[in-house]
Amino acid sequence: MAKDNKISASHILIMHTESRNSESKLSKEEALKLANKLHVKLKKDLSAFKDLAINHSSCSSAQYGGSLGEFGKGMMVKQFEEAAFALGVNELSEPIETEFGYHLIKRDK
C-alpha cells in the first residue's frame, strides 16, 4: 500500500454531452470509443501518456500531462479512487466511467 494511504496518478478525461459540467460535443458512445482508442495506443506505448493527455483530456490537468499529483482516499469520486488505488505503479486502467466522463488512469507512485 502507498505511504500514508496516498498515491500519485495521472489521467486522461474524455467528457461527453451527459458528463457533469461538460461542454463536450461528443456523445457518450463517441467518448467511450475515443477512450478505448487511446487505451489501445497506451497499452502499446505508455510513454505516450503525457502527450495524449495534453491533446485529448478535458481536465485542467491536461496542461500537466494529466498529472493529478498525490491524493488520498476520499478525495476522488468512488469509481476513480477504486480504480486508481487498485493499480500498481506504472499500470494503466481500462476506461473508467464516472459522472465526469471516461478516465484512463495511470498510477505514477
Where is each model-derived feature located?
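Sec-exported extracytoplasmic/periplasmic mature domains
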Residues: 39-47, 54-58, 85, 89
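Short beta-strand/turn micro-motifs at beta-sheet edges
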Residues: 1-2, 93
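Short, solvent-exposed helix-to-loop capping segments enriched in aromatics
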Residues: 75-87
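Glycine-rich, flexible loop/turn motifs
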Residues: 64-67, 88, 92
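FKBP-type peptidyl-prolyl cis-trans isomerase
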Residues: 7-17, 49-57, 80-83, 94-109
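Well-structured core secondary-structure elements of compact alpha/beta domains
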Residues: 2-44, 60-75, 105-109
